[in-house]
Amino acid sequence: MNPIGRQTQLKKMEADWDRRARENARFYVVTGQTEWSDEEFFQSGRKTVEEEILTDMTNICQGKDPRQMRVLEIGCGAGRITRALSETFGEVHGVDVSGEMVDLARRALADRPGVHVYKNNGMDLSVLPDLEFDFAFSCIVFQHIPSRAIIENYVREVHRVLRPGALFKFQVQGCAEIETSPDDTWLGAPITDQEAVRMAERCGFEPRYRIGAGEQYFWLWFFKKG
């Protein structure tokens, strides 16, 4: 993809997600219902953490005390999962392409010490301070990104900020049968099992586990080599 095409995609991602945040942020973050109370919305984030994090603490913590860990969330949205992460880990940093979503997250998480949320450009982590992270996580985010190249750039950037041996656990769209287009910021680019393995290797990760290939919820466990 030429740089102009990529910049067009990134601007559309930002504009579309800003619009969705203004229309009904919680619906677009979790499409199960149109109206969410605060308790329902953040409880849904706790459910994700219970299912995907707390059942996997051996891989995630690797002997570390979670209260001493610094974690990164890609695509924090309105802070749904971010809040739940902060209830388990000592320090949580989140990034999102939408400034509108980031504003919502900052307001919702103002009472949570150790939580930091940043607006980024949708493909890298240059907005983060010079920190090393013990774990990175992303759920129902990459499934909306319209370009495999942008997804891979994110993966490479996560590799850059993780400590050696740390895990990046994330979900991508695995269903190759869905019809997508380069400007679709809802049904993003699917990733096959072979593409996931090649991506991991190009970015310096070991793709130790992969579950759900060919399905919407294709989970990847990428461990940073070293």
Language model features with spans:
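A short glycine-rich, Lys/Arg-flanked "PGG" loop and its adjoining helix->strand segment in the class I
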Residues: 152-164
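Internal, well-ordered alpha-helical scaffold/interface segments
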Residues: 103, 139-143, 156
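A short SAM/SAH-binding and catalytic strip from SAM-dependent methyltransferases
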Residues: 135-149
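A short acidic, Gly/Pro-enriched loop at the edge of an enzyme's catalytic core
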Residues: 126-136
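Class I (Rossmann-like) S-adenosyl-L-methionine-dependent methyltransferase catalytic domain
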Residues: 1-89, 93-125, 148-149, 167-226
